[in-house]
Swiss-Prot record:
<keyword id="KW-0472">Membrane</keyword>
<dbReference type="InterPro" id="IPR030184">
    <property type="entry name" value="WAT1-related"/>
</dbReference>
<feature type="transmembrane region" description="Helical">
    <location>
        <begin position="180"/>
        <end position="200"/>
    </location>
</feature>
<feature type="transmembrane region" description="Helical">
    <location>
        <begin position="142"/>
        <end position="162"/>
    </location>
</feature>
<dbReference type="Pfam" id="PF00892">
    <property type="entry name" value="EamA"/>
</dbReference>
<dbReference type="GO" id="GO:0015186">
    <property type="term" value="F:L-glutamine transmembrane transporter activity"/>
</dbReference>
<feature type="transmembrane region" description="Helical">
    <location>
        <begin position="273"/>
        <end position="293"/>
    </location>
</feature>
<feature type="transmembrane region" description="Helical">
    <location>
        <begin position="245"/>
        <end position="265"/>
    </location>
</feature>
<feature type="transmembrane region" description="Helical">
    <location>
        <begin position="209"/>
        <end position="229"/>
    </location>
</feature>
<comment type="similarity">
    <text>Belongs to the drug/metabolite transporter (DMT) superfamily. Plant drug/metabolite exporter (P-DME) (TC 2.A.7.4) family.</text>
</comment>
<keyword id="KW-1133">Transmembrane helix</keyword>
<dbReference type="GO" id="GO:0005886">
    <property type="term" value="C:plasma membrane"/>
</dbReference>
<keyword id="KW-0677">Repeat</keyword>
<feature type="transmembrane region" description="Helical">
    <location>
        <begin position="102"/>
        <end position="122"/>
    </location>
</feature>
<keyword id="KW-0812">Transmembrane</keyword>
<protein>
    <recommendedName>
        <fullName>WAT1-related protein At2g40900</fullName>
    </recommendedName>
</protein>
<dbReference type="InterPro" id="IPR000620">
    <property type="entry name" value="EamA_dom"/>
</dbReference>
Length: 394
């Protein structure tokens, strides 16, 4: 039981750790952007480091299981590189430079809501409002949005927890806030689209390490082309062994290569809604780290927003947990227990009969449609004393 609980907790632990990595990336990149580093150059180097970090593992571990590359899959990977490494990262860095890590991560909490909408439209997530679990997921997502809005538009009085000498930080101009909000909302839309497309692509190309490598490599090429066009000066791509290089390496290795790998694994197991449900934790972590590391003050609106955010995140995760339990229960119900005496060699096929079929058998009035359909069966092969069972779906 303990081992089983440990296995079930691994996805949650992995996603929480990932949010700490994203929070650190916010603080480090904010520092280098304020010092004058171009976000186009930062994105290009970030994806170059990500490619170099993840490519060896993909080449060694997936050389025998790598799926065949087709043109439709290649175009999906190209689009993934455009949505994630290029559009999302550049727009997010613009918003981050204009405001603060807390504000940027707060606006990005709209990602789970957009992901649920897109996943529902593409039939990757079922939303049945008559069921409590689905209603809780939707309401939890809306609550996270409300918490983000509180953190963005309501500051309230300054809170000095330890009676320190921290003072309320000066706010950027309103025009910068509005401009940053637009860029961050567009980045969130691109990021949510990336998650949904990644989940769909993994069903066609299951080698997630190889796919992450190709996404990072494509993103590097696209980002370099964009940097050359926007900077108008090739020397802008030159960086030394300084904070700029450290920020690029950290963002590339932690927030791109490792993040894409972990997200890909969780996407295959839990789906895009589960992955994005943890995004609101970033603003909580960033707020705490900004207070202790950067010396930025905390306001009452931020504290209230964090509490509301946590309630929303818990509601969404509870709904997903109930969904997962329901899927496991339905899977177990599809397995038919077969009891036979040892020593009977041969092949036994037993169809699964539901309640409606039982009534038809009893009355002898089974319809022709039921006769033409292929029932789910369990094939049991008896060879000496060994029993092997194979479940075949409809």
């Amino acid at each position: 039981m303990g081992l089983r609980m440990s296995e079930s907790a691994k996805p949650y632990f992995a996603m929480v750790c990932l949010q700490f990595g994203y929070a650190g990336m916010n603080l480090v990149t904010k520092t280098v952007l304020d010092r004058g580093m171009s976000h186009y150059v930062l994105v290009a180097y970030r994806n170059a480091f990500a490619t170099a970090a993840i490519a060896p593992f993909a080449l060694l571990s997936e050389r025998k299981v790598r799926s065949k590359m087709t043109f439709p899959i290649f175009m999906r990977i190209f689009l993934l590189a455009l949505l994630g490494p290029v559009i999302d990262q550049n727009l997010y860095y613009i918003g981050l430079k204009l405001t603060s890590p807390t504000f940027s991560s707060a606006v990005s909490n709209i990602v789970p809501a957009i992901t649920i909408i897109l996943a529902t439209l593409f039939r990757m997530e079922k939303v049945e409002m008559r069921k409590v679990r689905c209603l809780v997921k939707v309401m939890g997502t809306l609550v996270t949005v409300v918490g983000s809005i509180l953190m963005i538009f309501y500051k309230g009085p300054f809170i000095n927890f330890f009676r320190s000498h921290l003072t309320a930080a000066s706010s950027p101009p309103t025009a910068d806030y509005l401009k940053a909000a637009v860029f961050l909302l567009l980045a969130s839309l691109s990021w949510a689209s990336f998650f949904v497309l990644q989940a769909a692509t993994l069903k066609k190309y299951s080698a997630h390490l190889s796919m992450s490598t190709m996404v990072c490599f494509m993103g590097t090429l696209q980002s370099l082309a964009l940097a050359f066009v926007m900077e108008h000066n090739p020397s802008a791509l030159n960086i030394g062994f300084d904070m700029n290089l450290l920020a690029s390496a950290y963002a590339g290795i932690m927030s791109s290569s490792i993040a894409y790998y972990v997200q890909g694994l969780m996407m295959q197991r839990k789906g895009p809604v589960f992955v994005t449900a943890f995004n609101p934790l970033i603003v909580v972590i960033v707020s705490i780290m900004s207070f202790f590391v950067l010396g930025q003050g905390i306001y009452l609106g931020g504290v209230i927003g964090v509490v509301v955010l946590m309630v929303g995140v818990y509601a969404v995760l509870w709904g997903k947990h109930v969904d997962d339990d329901g899927e496991e229960t339905r899977h177990e119900d599809n397995v038919v227990a077969v009891k036979c005496c040892s020593g009977n060699n041969g092949l036994t096929i037993m169809p699964k009969i539901d309640e409606a079929d039982e009534e038809d058998v009893e009355t002898g009035k089974a319809t022709s449609e039921k006769e033409s359909s292929v029932p789910e069966v369990v094939v049991v092969v008896f060879c000496s004393e060994n029993v092997h069972s194979v479940s075949r779906p409809n």
